[in-house]
Amino acid sequence: MLHLLRSLTPNQRGAVIASYLGWTLDAFDFFIFVFVLKDVAQEFHTDVETVTYAILLTLAARPVGALLFGLAADRYGRRPVLMVDILLFSMLEFASGLAPSLTIFLILRLAFGVAMGGEWGVGAALAMETIPAGTRGVVSGILQTGYPSGYLLAAITYFALYGLIGWRGMFMIGVLPALLVLYIRGKVEESPAFLARAHAKFGAGLVKMLRSHAVRFLYAVLLMTAFNFLSHGTQDLYPAFLQLQHHFSQQTVGLIAIVYNFGAILGGLLFGALSQRIGRRRAIVIAALLTLPVIPVWAYGASPLTLAVGAFLMQFAVQGAWGVVPAHLNELSPEDMRGTFPGFAYQIGNLLASANATLQAGIAEANGGNYGFALATVAAIVAVTLAVLAHFGIEAHGVNFAGARVDPNDGSIRS
C-alpha cells in the first residue's frame, strides 16, 4: 500500500490530501452535534427525540447540496467548487453555535446539510480523476476514512474541551476547516479528466443521467440507502446510548468514541486496499456480514471495556465496507457526470436514511428507553440488506476515466 502512495506525483498527493481533509473536516462539523444532543435539548427545553430532527434535516438536505455543487463542479471544475463548499459549511457550523432558538438552530442545520452534501462527491471526483487507476482501492479507503477521522476529531474535542467551552463553543470550533481552502488554493490543481472535457453545459449531466442511466442510478441509490442506514444506524445515537442507557460520564463516552473511530479508520484502509485485489462488491459483502456476530457485544455489552471492544469491531466492519465506496461509485459513474452522479446517489441514499436517528430513538422509547435494542435491530436488518444488494449488483472495477484521454498509470492527459 505504501509503495502505491509513494508513486503518486505531488499534484496527485495534493488532490488526495485535500479530498481526505475536506471530508474529515466536514464529518467533524457534523459529528460535533451527536455529542451534544442532550445539551441542545436542555438548552431549548425539549427532549432528545425532538432534537434529532436536526440530524434528519441535515441528512435530508444533503442531496440538494450534492446536486447543486455536483452540477457546478461538472461545469466550472472540481477545485473552485470544493473551496466554496468548504467555506460555506464552516461558516454555517459556526453560526449554529450562536442559534438563539430551536427554530433558528434547525434552519441552520438544514442549510449546513446543503453544504455538507456538496463536499463528498466533488472531493472524491477530484481525487479519483487525478490518481492512477491502480491506486484507486487504496486511495478510496483513505478518502472514506476521512469520515471516521472527523468523528474521531469530534470525540477528542468533546473529551478535551467540552467542559471548558460547552456545546456552543464546540460548534464555533467548527469554523476552523475554512483554513483548508488556503491549502487547496496553493497546492491542488484541477482534475486532468475534467480539463480534458471542460465547458460542459450546466445541468446537462443531470438530464442525461436521468434519461440514459436511470437503472444504474437507481441501483446506486438503493446501495447507498443501505450504506447510510448502516453507517448512521451504528454511529449517530451511539453516544446517546452510552449516556442515557448506561449513564457513562462524558470522559468515558469520549474515550469509547475515540476507540471505535480508530477501528473505523483501520477498517476503511484495509477493505479499500483489499477491494483492489478481490473486487469492490466482494469486499463490501465480507465487511457487511462481519457486523452480524459483533452486534451482541456492541449493543448488549455491560461494561465500558466490553462496549468499547464491540464498538471497535463494529466500526471496523461498517467503515470497512464504506472504504470501498469512493472508488466503486466513481467507477460506476458515467464519464461526463462524475461530479454529479456519485455524490447525488450517495446523498439521495442519505435522504432515504435520514429518519434513522428519529426512528431509532422512537424504537428505544417504545421499548422503555432500550437504545441497545433499537441499535441492534436496525444494524442487523441493514447489514444483510447491504450484503444482498452488493452481491447481486454491478461493478466497473478498474474502468478508465476520460476514455483514451487520461493515462491510467499516471493520470496525465493523452491526445
Residue spans for each PLM region:
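Extracytoplasmic gate region of multi-pass secondary transporters
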Residues: V34, A214-I265, A353-A357
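Cytoplasmic helix-loop-helix junction between adjacent transmembrane helices
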Residues: L108-T145
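Conserved MFS/SLC helix-loop-helix module at the cytosolic interface between two early adjacent transmembrane helices
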Residues: V64-P100, I278
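C-terminal transmembrane helical hairpin of 12-TM major facilitator-type secondary transporters
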Residues: S275, R281-V325
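Cytosolic juxtamembrane N-terminal segment immediately preceding the first transmembrane helix
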Residues: M1-F28
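Helix-loop-helix hairpin linking two adjacent transmembrane segments in secondary transporters
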Residues: L143-G186
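Extracellular/periplasmic helix-loop-helix junction of adjacent transmembrane segments
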Residues: V34-V64, Q251
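Helix-breaking motifs and short loop linkers at transmembrane-helix boundaries and internal kinks
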Residues: H45, G77, L98-I104, P132, ...
